[in-house]
């Protein structure tokens, strides 16, 4: 249990028995609002609580007066060394140094398992991510969402969830017809025809490889086949080839999905029809007309009666059409059928990773999941923004004249998988990210992945060069008394809290920020050793101080390794 969690537990125990003006806290919903957290300004103490402010709403007493009563009660908590009140009623604590020293002992005993917490309790979570159209190899633009989804899955597994990683193959839309036509042209090209890639077709040279496969299997036989037979063959061969490419690209990033679900297979299994029938049973479908969509003024638009889902009953802005004019299902109908399929497989919690251009899908999909599950299932939709690729500040062209894009393979060959994974997590997922090819391979503190890996490598260099140290139970850690040492220990103590909040908010970038902060504090402490021999990790003729500092350094190594493992990044023990 983290220091913050320990103090919060003690405070709750005190509040359960405390009587203020005949008010005793018995309602757990009140305690759910209780915060014990780290202040933004360390001058305000190690931790603070809003307990007095929360209670003032129920006791009808000035929060400063309540805080003074609480201070008398909380002062007996053994981990607290001093306590004070600041307006409008926050209570600040400093924690005993012995508590912080115990953190070093705990980390060295648990090693990379320090900070592990289980609040998932084996609950199943479905995370769908990537789901790129199977019309070509994955370009680098797909990497951010892919890495985010994979790391989020790792993170949720770390806190006790059973995670299923899923990829939805969009193999039933109009893009597949375009793919088939584009591949057929390349097949003709292999046969010796001069071809013209028309507007709207896929021009990528990679399609020629599929044309060659078809030629090897069928020679010129496809030319004489009827359209439907030829389409089926080209479709099946193309999808098999391209999904193989996509899986290989994902493997280069260190990503492997558990399940690949086919849109066309769901259609064959009548999942859309079953989903619509369920919504009809719930009386959530009607026939009506919609207002003209915003932004289409001046376009020849006519209202028409269509099948609509009552998504506004569940928080959406407008009701949604399920059928097109020709009777085929809309994209949205297929999307909600897919989530109906997930729910039917027993998933009560789903996470969907999408590009930020899909923001309009958030409310409608949440409405659909709520309707289909009677409110028993939830979906959390995480959006990721674009990545600007630069080379020493200059924009990198993402596409070539051939119609091919900068691929994941291109980038990994240039900078390596682990660098790509780390850099993609250095910003909140919905914020635009700059990826500079020159900067991500720099060996400087301006390169966060180098800075963190260098800290881990420094720890291992120190361990390799250290003399034999004392057993940990024999070390007097009170010799770690400098401001910089105590700051580093307090940072290390936050690791469990960082893991927990990152998982609960589905924001793995918080771990990146934390690892950079740890590396910065460790490098700063190392730098003080260059200025003063008394601050070095290895101090001649002082085995106790050397041992204490080595265990502190090892703690840094264990925590950094634990964080990088969540990212599926190999912690380096020496820099190349």
From Swiss-Prot:
- Where found? Cytoplasm
User: Pfam families of this UniProt entry?
Assistant: Arg_tRNA_synt_N, DALR_1, tRNA-synt_1d
Query: Which UniProt keywords are listed?
Result: Aminoacyl-tRNA synthetase, ATP-binding, Cytoplasm, Ligase, Nucleotide-binding, Protein biosynthesis
HAMAP family reported in the protein's UniProt record? Arg_tRNA_synth
Q: What SMART domains does the database record attribute to this sequence?
A: Arg_tRNA_synt_N, DALR_1
Q: GO BP, one example?
A: arginyl-tRNA aminoacylation
**Enzyme class, UniProt record, top EC level:** ligase
Q: Where are the transmembrane segments?
A: none
Question: Does the keyword section mention Oxidoreductase?
Answer: no
> What gene name is given for the protein in this entry?
argS
Family statement: Belongs to the class-I aminoacyl-tRNA synthetase family.
What lineage, starting at the top, does this entry show? Bacteria, Pseudomonadati, Pseudomonadota, Alphaproteobacteria, Rickettsiales
Relate the assembly described in the record: Monomer.
What reaction is this protein's catalytic activity?
tRNA(Arg) + L-arginine + ATP = L-arginyl-tRNA(Arg) + AMP + diphosphate
Motif stretch ('HIGH' region): 132-142
User: What are its GO cellular component terms?
Assistant: cytoplasm
Species for this entry: Ehrlichia ruminantium (strain Welgevonden)
In Swiss-Prot or TrEMBL terms, this protein is called Arginine--tRNA ligase
A GO molecular-function term, please?
ATP binding
The record's principal subcellular location, in a coarse class, is cytoplasm
């Amino acid at each position: 249990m983290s220091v913050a969690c320990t103090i919060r537990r003690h405070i709750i125990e005190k509040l359960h028995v405390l009587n203020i003006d005949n008010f005793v806290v018995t309602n757990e919903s009140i305690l759910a609002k209780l915060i014990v957290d780290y202040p933004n300004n360390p001058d305000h103490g190690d931790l603070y609580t809003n307990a007095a402010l929360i209670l003032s709403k129920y006791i009808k007493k000035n929060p400063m007066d309540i805080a003074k009563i609480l201070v008398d009660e909380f002062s007996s908590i053994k981990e607290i060394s001093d306590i004070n009140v600041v307006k409008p009623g926050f209570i600040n604590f400093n924690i005993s140094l012995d508590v912080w020293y115990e953190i070093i002992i705990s980390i060295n005993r648990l090693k990379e398992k320090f900070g592990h917490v289980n609040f998932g309790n084996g609950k199943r979570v479905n995370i769908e991510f990537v789901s790129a159209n199977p019309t070509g190899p994955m370009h680098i633009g797909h990497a951010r969402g892919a890495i985010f989804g994979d790391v989020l899955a790792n993170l949720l597994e770390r806190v006790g969830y059973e995670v299923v990683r899923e990829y939805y193959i969009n193999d039933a839309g109009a893009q597949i017809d375009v793919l088939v036509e584009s591949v057929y042209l390349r097949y003709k090209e292999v046969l010796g025809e001069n071809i013209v890639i028309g507007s709207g077709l896929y021009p990528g040279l990679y399609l020629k490889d599929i044309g060659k496969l078809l030629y090897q299997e069928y020679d010129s036989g496809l030319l004489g086949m009827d359209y439907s037979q030829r389409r089926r063959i080209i479709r099946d061969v193309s999808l098999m080839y391209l999904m193989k490419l996509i899986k290989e690209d994902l493997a280069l990033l260190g990503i492997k999905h558990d399940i690949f679900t086919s849109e066309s297979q769901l259609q064959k299994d009548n999942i859309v029809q079953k989903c619509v029938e369920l919504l009809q049973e719930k009386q959530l479908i009607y026939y009506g007309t919609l207002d003209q969509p915003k932004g289409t003024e001046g376009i020849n638009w006519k209202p028409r009666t269509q099948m609509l889902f009552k998504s506004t009953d569940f928080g959406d802005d407008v009701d949604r059409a399920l059928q097109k004019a020709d009777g085929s299902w809309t994209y949205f109908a297929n999307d909600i059928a897919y989530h109906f399929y997930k729910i039917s497989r027993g998933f009560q919690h789903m996470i969907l990773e999408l590009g930020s251009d899909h923001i309009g899908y958030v409310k409608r999909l949440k409405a659909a999941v709520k309707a289909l599950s009677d409110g028993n299932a939830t979906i959390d939709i995480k959006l990721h923004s674009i990545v600007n690729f630069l080379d020493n500040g200059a924009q990198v062209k993402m596409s070539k004249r051939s119609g091919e894009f900068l691929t994941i393979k291109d980038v990994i060959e240039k900078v390596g998988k682990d660098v790509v994974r780390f850099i993609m997590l250095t910003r909140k997922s919905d914020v635009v990210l700059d990826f500079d090819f020159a900067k991500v391979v720099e060996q400087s503190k301006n390169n966060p992945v180098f800075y963190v890996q260098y800290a881990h490598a420094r720890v291992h260099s120190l361990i390799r060069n250290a003399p034999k140290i004392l057993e940990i139970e024999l070390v007097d850690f009170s010799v770690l008394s400098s401001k910089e040492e105590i700051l580093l220990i307090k940072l290390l103590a936050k690791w469990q809290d960082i893991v927990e909040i990152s998982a609960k908010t589905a924001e793995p970038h918080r771990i990146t920020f934390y690892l950079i902060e740890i590396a910065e504090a460790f490098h700063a402490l190392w730098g003080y050793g260059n200025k003063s021999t008394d601050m070095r990790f290895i101090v001649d003729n002082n085995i106790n101080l050397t041992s204490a500092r080595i265990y502190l350094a090892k703690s840094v190594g264990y925590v950094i390794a634990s964080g990088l493992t969540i990212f599926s990044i190999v912690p380096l023990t020496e820099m190349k």
